Amino acid sequence: KESAAAKFERQHMDPSPSSASSSNYCNQMMQSRDLTQDRCKPVNTFVHESLADVQAVCFQKNVACKNGQSNCYQSNSAMHITDCRETGSSKYPNCVYKTTQAEKHIIVACEGNPYVPVHFDASV
């Protein structure tokens, strides 16, 4: 079974995107990372930084998660990210996404040993 850490990498990590600037980026990535398998995942964020830099966030600023848990961490610096958001015309199995690039601080939930990101909580 896929570990929570591996799932985070599959769903959220894209360190050196070949086509993040393309408006089609989300449509391609959401499909290739299996985020449209049994439904269209409505919202998803890809982080264009090294895995080491994202894992390091687990040792940065401790903040509360959206669900009230206390194991979330906010990155000290802004990171290159791409937000993918399902459009109104999207209907499974033809999932359609809007691609938005940004530079924001990320908030991730971490757990385990080694202590690594297992959930993408927000960007600010």
UniProtKB/Swiss-Prot annotation:
The positions annotated for binding substrate are K7, R10, K41, P42, V43, N44, T45, K66, R85
- S-S pairs: C26-C84, C40-C95, C58-C110, C65-C72
Its BP terms in the Gene Ontology are: defense response to Gram-positive bacterium
Q: Tell me the keywords, alphabetical order.
A: Disulfide bond, Endonuclease, Hydrolase, Lyase, Nuclease, Secreted
In this protein, the active site sits at: H12, H119
Which InterPro entries would you find in this protein's record? RNaseA (IPR001427), RNaseA-like_dom_sf (IPR036816), RNaseA_AS (IPR023411), RNaseA_domain (IPR023412)
Q: What EC number(s) does the entry state? A: 4.6.1.18
Question: Where does it localize?
Answer: Secreted
Query: Which reaction(s) are listed as its catalytic activity?
Result: an [RNA] containing cytidine + H2O = an [RNA]-3'-cytidine-3'-phosphate + a 5'-hydroxy-ribonucleotide-3'-[RNA]; an [RNA] containing uridine + H2O = an [RNA]-3'-uridine-3'-phosphate + a 5'-hydroxy-ribonucleotide-3'-[RNA]
Ranges of compositional bias, category Basic and acidic residues: 1-13
| Gene3D superfamilies referenced in this protein's UniProt entry, alphabetically | Ribonuclease A-like domain
Region: Disordered; residue ranges are 1-25
Q: In which tissues is it expressed?
A: Pancreas.
Molecular function (GO) terms for this protein are: lyase activity; nucleic acid binding; ribonuclease A activity
Q: Which GO terms describe its cellular component?
A: extracellular region
Question: Pfam families recorded for this chain?
Answer: RnaseA
The subunit structure is:
Monomer. Interacts with and forms tight 1:1 complexes with RNH1. Dimerization of two such complexes may occur. Interaction with RNH1 inhibits this protein.
What is the stated purpose of this protein? Endonuclease that catalyzes the cleavage of RNA on the 3' side of pyrimidine nucleotides. Acts on single-stranded and double-stranded RNA.
Family stated for the protein in its record: Belongs to the pancreatic ribonuclease family.
This protein is called what?
A: Ribonuclease pancreatic
Give the originating organism: Rangifer tarandus (Reindeer)
